[in-house]
Amino acid sequence: KYDPYLMKVVNQDTFKWYALEDGKTYGYPNYSNTKADYESGNIPVNDNFVIREDVYNALGKPDVSTPENFEKVMQQIKEKYPEMTPMGFTTVGDGAGPFLDKLQDFLGVPLEDKNGKYYDRNLDKEYLEWLKTFNDVYRAGNISDDSFTDDGATFDEKVKQGNYATMLVAGTSGQGGNFTEFMKKSGTRYIAIDGPSSTSGRKPTLNQTGISGWLSNYITKDAKDPAKVTQLFTYLIDEPGQILTKYGVEGVTYAYNDQGKIDYLPEVKKLEQTDNDAYNK
């Protein structure tokens, strides 16, 4: 009604998914991944097991993919770096934090059995074995009591100080500023490695935002100029708007290279590596 071109730029799978019982769609997400997006192989994971690079190298780049090795390495860290907490993790909140579906994804725990029926991931044998391993690590003093009660701000500060030798991180993108701040202060950094893994050969099934998206946007009935708002939606969803919100302004933050692809300008790349908060702004 207000901008027919909108229907040409929206992702039809996402648009239809948002339709209500009356068949109409009233909102659209700012970030949505469809089945085709996942199958393209271009969707980065957002959950990682990370370790301080200096610790990793000092210990000879150890393997922590099995329960036995994991427990042994945590003890080695405790003995070699008594000032650090061997393992930390993103905030638990009201649930189990990264120790529920995130850990299950690392272990490749299926959602359904071979017959297509519901599979209770919480009772998976390998998952329970890893939970016991984490409990043993905790009882050995290699996971702090504070990790279960720290709020987001407290956890962030500990990451900036490099207090944790290793971490199970749910939502790595949200830690970019903290990782950069630590790197600036310390001369080392956190790196992602293969963490807890399946002992039976299952591949990890790390997840990302699905078709429902992240934040949903709506045009209210009280909008004074719904046509203008719809046109803004169209622009932001279309390629020019996507480039603007991702890369900024041509000649100011990015330029096209000889292959016709977008490259950040050198000063922007440097800002990303040295001041993540300023880069995000």
Task: Please tell me what each predicted stretch does.
Residues 1-281:
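Extracytoplasmic/secretory soluble proteins
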